[in-house]
């Protein structure tokens, strides 16, 4: 089953103080929903944490010496045991950098840089916003090819 086969559209959230509590439902894609939320709410700087369940997830490993991501898609029932990441800005738009850990039906762990993740049950995500902005820029030393924090 590919990530594009089933879409949900019922993400709900509540703003409590300066933070957000987000519920994702079956079929919703984590990166799309969180990016949309950040755009709509003007979230420029935040930390992300969450848990949930997925039936299709794409994570990757970045090979620093090759300056290349190696993505891998996983399908089947998975518990998302941890989503951890940040929201910053790149070119004036939200830039989400999230890592995910999950386990499959045999409780074998997978994890890496999150590219896509479709929710199969529910997703429970917290965004802790911070005042100000942090941008992104390519590694100034050219050693990694990564988009690193830019403190302007």
Per-range role (PLM):
Residues 8-96, 101-152:
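N-terminal intrinsically disordered, cationic/polar leader segments
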